[in-house]
Amino acid sequence: MAIVKCKPTSAGRRHVVKVVNTELHKGKPFAALLDTKSKTGGRNNLGRITTRHIGGGHKQHYRLIDFKRNKLDIPAVVERLEYDPNRSANIALVLYKDGERRYILAPKGLVAGDTIQAGASAPIKVGNSLPMRNIPVGSTVHNVELKPGKGGQIARSAGAYVQIIAREGNYVTLRLRSGEMRKVLAECSATIGEVGNSEHMLRVLGKAGANRWRGIRPTVRGTAMNPVDHPHGGGEGRNFGKHPVTPWGVQTKGKKTRHNKRTDKFIVRRRGK
């Protein structure tokens, strides 16, 4: 994998920094594992905007990723690594011994030809998935389940990982990248290693159009709007003279947004503390 800075042949290329991975498959994806992906433009079924800054972008197919890793004790060979436009991580096409193919998240260090396996008896090896009760304390894992059998929900983006720091009874304690420490059932499965493509954060798009290709529309500051459009709008100069709020008047700095009290007991330490 290489970090390539483009030559300044135009204003739009001057600041572009690309992440080039020569190991990625250059052909088409595996058709049987593709699904349609329709554009919403950020609108709901009433045609009202529910998520701002969404619209346009290149047409894409969704890749069906196996987050559950529920083909147990059947070895699989990594056929190739592929680019996935729907996520920051790369994906790997694996062929199981029984002939079935699936996509999985490509962990760091996994290459074509490697053998992986899922199940309680799987060895501690990058790409293998097993219950966290069987993973040594101190190990780095990704694609971590919150409920047994539901599929991985934590640490799925490029370069993400979670560290197992303790095991007590039916629970393991995890340290997340945010600094949060939380308990999860030891029966939940996780995949050994960290998610690959960690250089993703180093890329520089270089121009506004590159975001438009990705379906991301501009974000306009509230203070640049009129009073009818935003609480920060209007007035002389750039000062809006009040506490920062969202377009709907909700405080935007320091206000807690978590409401799930039922699972508060599993959080040992909050993030950022």
From Swiss-Prot:
Signal peptide boundaries: none
Regions crossing the membrane: none
Listed SMART domains: Ribosomal_L2 (SM01383), Ribosomal_L2_C (SM01382)
Subunit structure: Part of the 50S ribosomal subunit. Forms a bridge to the 30S subunit in the 70S ribosome.
Coiled-coil positions: none
Record's protein name: Large ribosomal subunit protein uL2
This protein's GO CC annotations: large ribosomal subunit
The protein's role, per its UniProt record: One of the primary rRNA binding proteins. Required for association of the 30S and 50S subunits to form the 70S ribosome, for tRNA binding and peptide bond formation. It has been suggested to have peptidyltransferase activity; this is somewhat controversial. Makes several contacts with the 16S rRNA in the 70S ribosome.
Region (Disordered): 221-273
Stated family: Belongs to the universal ribosomal protein uL2 family.
Annotated GO MF terms: rRNA binding; structural constituent of ribosome; transferase activity
GO biological process: cytoplasmic translation
This protein's UniProt keywords: Ribonucleoprotein, Ribosomal protein, RNA-binding, rRNA-binding
Highest taxon, organism lineage: Bacteria
Biased composition (Basic residues): 253-273
